[in-house]
Structures are given as structure tokens and as C-alpha cells.
């Protein structure tokens, strides 16, 4: 297999989950991805955006992790979780995928807006990186394999 580096941008979304989903995912229960309505909506959004997670022969590629987010709700907020002045900790599903760094801003804006629409929080945590390099497969011809001598 031939590997080449590809210029991409990283999209990371922090998604609140309940304790049961957190526990199931931590135990490796893959069914929890489909059983949790929020994560299922996030994965549908990934599947609907062909630009996200495109690694050639593999589509809709993502990575995930579990963690906690901490915050204190300020006056004037309309929180989904927590109360004004109270420090709150939320079990969190951290979703990461990549897209081509050359993708135009209109397409990036479209899928980012979609994530904001379906995210349960008043202010979702969505990170977009500057271009970075990640490995991917390259056609054999790129390396002169199989080419006539």
C-alpha cells in the first residue's frame, strides 16, 4: 500500500450524552451509536455530507472519544443542562472527522450550520482547524508502480 499526505481540515464536535450512553460506549457497545438519538443524528449528518470523512476507498470516516465538559452558566443563558451560577459537568461524546482543505467556504458553512441546527446545546462546541496533513492511500501510479519502464 502506498501512503501520501493529504491537506485536510479537522472538524471536531463536542456532543452531550447521558450517563448510560457514556457507560455503554466506554464498554465498547457499538449499538449505543445508533441507540442514542443525538449521536445517531450526528452520524446521519456525516453520511449526508459526502465531503466529510472522505479517505478514498473509505467514506464517512470519523474518530470518537469520551470525556467531560465543564462550564458555569452565566446570567442570561438558556442552558440545556445546569443552572445559572452553578458549575456543571457534562458527559461528552467527542466526534472528529476531516475534509479536504481545498473545500470551498460555502460547503464548509453548509455542514457547519447543519451541525448547529441539530446540536442540543444553546452554544455548541464545534472546532474547525486550519489545514493540516493526514495520511491517506495513493494510487500506485503516483509512485511509479506498474508504470512502463
Ranges and model annotations:
Residues 1-149:
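Hydrophobic structural segments
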Amino acid at each position: 500500500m502506498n501512503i501520501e499526505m493529504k491537506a485536510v481540515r479537522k472538524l471536531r464536535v463536542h456532543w452531550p450524552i447521558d450517563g448510560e450512553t457514556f457507560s455503554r460506549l466506554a464498554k465498547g457497545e457499538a449499538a449505543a451509536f445508533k441507540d442514542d438519538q443525538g449521536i445517531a443524528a450526528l452520524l446521519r449528518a456525516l453520511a449526508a455530507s459526502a465531503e466529510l470523512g472522505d479517505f478514498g476507498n473509505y467514506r464517512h470516516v470519523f474518530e470518537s472519544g469520551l470525556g467531560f465538559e465543564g462550564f458555569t452558566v452565566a446570567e442570561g443563558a438558556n442552558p440545556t443542562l445546569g443552572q445559572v451560577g452553578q458549575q456543571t459537568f457534562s458527559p461528552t461524546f467527542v466526534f472528529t472527522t476531516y475534509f479536504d482543505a481545498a473545500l470551498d467556504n460555502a460547503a464548509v458553512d453548509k455542514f457547519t450550520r447543519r451541525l448547529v441546527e441539530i446540536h442540543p446545546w444553546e452554544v455548541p462546541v464545534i472546532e474547525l482547524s486550519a489545514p493540516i496533513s493526514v495520511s491517506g492511500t495513493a494510487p500506485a501510479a503516483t509512485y511509479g508502480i506498474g508504470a512502463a519502464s
